[in-house]
A protein has these predicted regions:
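Structural signal for the C-terminal ends of transmembrane alpha-helices
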Residues: 15-18, 74-78, 107, 135-140, ...
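Intrinsic disorder in cytosolic terminal tails and internal cytosolic loops
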Residues: 82, 322-327, 355-372
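12-transmembrane solute porter fold
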Residues: 61, 105, 118-130, 139-313, ...
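Phenylalanine-glycine-rich, low-complexity intrinsically disordered regions
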Residues: 81-82, 97-120, 135-137
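Peri-membrane helix termini and adjoining interfacial loops of integral membrane proteins
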Residues: 69, 312-324
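Flexible interhelical linker loops that connect adjacent transmembrane helices
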Residues: 70-97, 139-154, 215-216, 363-368
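Glycine/proline-centered helix-kink
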Residues: 8, 35-47, 51, 100, ...
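Helix-loop-helix hairpins in multi-pass membrane proteins, especially solute transporters
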Residues: 1-91, 118, 201, 278
Length: 372
């Protein structure tokens, strides 16, 4: 809950503080690099705690960091409040939360009970109904949770849709690759944490490059090729087997994926806040974060279904492998999921290609105008 409050607030503060697009791009680059560094520390620390203490320690390790950040925020972050109607959209909150829960749980149930299960169908139908009601509410309430003017602008709407698809394709990669490293290759939790460092290093390095290029070339020339590169990196992961080497088959994929995703994340953050008013920056930032998280949840649930089905089918068709069948079946399930993940990233590239129509000139003009 508190992370959901923090992430949009951080992006909103950057947006209203850095009004010059070149400076804002650098600020987003710094955020990207810090996030990458934090991810590296988290993977290693989480692996160490899991291996040498208990996984429960991972749930409390953020407490001292959060306390320190809160103290610094009180000292350095200036308070700001939205003007006008500040009432809270309770009906919107209820229908949106229930709708997204039903959608995610419906995909989850499909993995265990199948798409024809009455429970799966019931949750998915309920999700559609609740989300339609949510949109109807947002059109009528005075202070909507999600003002439609924020998402109906072409570039912002495309950014949120692209973020949803990218989250669906990327988040599941970490799940399946982590399982491959630990279950198939036998990596310890700590070693698995170190194994993801190439991805982190790629994000840190290319986030700085993306922040420098964004004001010069605009967002689309970075995001579309970036997603294509990331998709290629995912496709390279389909070469893995229970006997392949981490250095030759996993590291190159992680480096290609991370370089591509860094070229996406920085411009995507900028386009998601394109031409938005100060009053709506918090909502626009929250939409970006929400679309990523919802995409990750839906993608993980959906691709878990895909991987489980592929694993079961392979095991049934190759029973002659005996005791070796499960490692090969699980790896096959992972590779099928990676193919679907790559397809989602390619779909994201198509979405951003057709929706994003701002160049470097309009990025400067519209963003400069909206904050002065």
């Amino acid at each position: 809950v508190f992370a959901a409050l923090l992430a949009p607030a951080a992006l909103s503060i950057i947006s209203v503080t850095f009004t010059v697009p070149a400076e804002r791009a650098k600020a987003f680059g710094v955020i990207g690099a810090i996030s990458g560094g934090g991810a590296a520390i988290g993977l290693i620390l989480g692996g160490a705690l899991t291996e040498y203490a208990s996984w429960r320690w991972c749930l409390g390790v953020n407490t001292p960091i959060a306390i320190g950040a809160a103290i610094l925020a009180i000292k350095f972050v200036h308070e700001s409040k939205a003007q006008g109607d500040n009432t809270y959209d309770i009906p919107g909150v209820i229908t949106a939360t229930a709708g997204l829960f039903s959608l995610t749980y419906g995909f989850h149930e499909a993995a265990t009970k199948g798409w024809s299960s009455s429970l799966t169908i019931g949750f998915l139908v309920s999700a559609v109904f609740l989300l339609v009601i949510f949109v109807a509410i947002e059109k009528r309430v005075a202070n909507p949770l999600m003002p439609l003017r924020v998402v109906t602008e072409r570039n912002r709407g495309g950014s949120y849709l692209g973020s949803l698809v990218v989250g669906a394709g990327l988040f599941s990669m970490f799940l399946f690759l982590g399982l491959y490293l630990q279950v198939i290759l036998g990596f310890s939790p700590l070693k698995s944490g170190f194994a993801f460092l190439p991805f982190t290093f790629g994000i840190i390095i290319f986030a700085g490059i993306a922040s420098q290029l964004l004001p010069k070339v605009g967002p689309k020339p970075l995001m579309v090729p970036g997603l294509i590169f990331a998709g290629i990196g995912l496709l390279l992961l389909t070469r893995i087997t229970p006997d392949t080497s981490y250095l030759t088959h996993v590291v190159p994929s992680l480096l290609i994926m991370s370089s591509g995703m860094a070229l996406v994340f920085i411009p995507l953050t900028s386009t998601s806040l394109h031409a938005v008013s100060n009053h709506d920056t918090g909502v626009a930032s929250a939409m970006l974060n929400t679309s990523q998280q919802v995409g990750g949840s839906l993608g993980t649930a959906l691709l878990n279904t895909v991987a489980a089905t592929a694993t079961t089918t392979f095991a049934a068709a190759n029973s002659q492998l005996g005791e070796k069948v499960m490692p090969f079946a699980m790896t096959h399930g992972f590779t099928v999921a990676f193919k679907f993940s790559a397809a989602l990233l390619f779909v994201g590239a198509v979405v951003l290609f057709f929706f994003i129509n701002i160049g470097k000139e309009s990025l400067v003009e519209t963003e400069g105008a909206s904050f002065h």
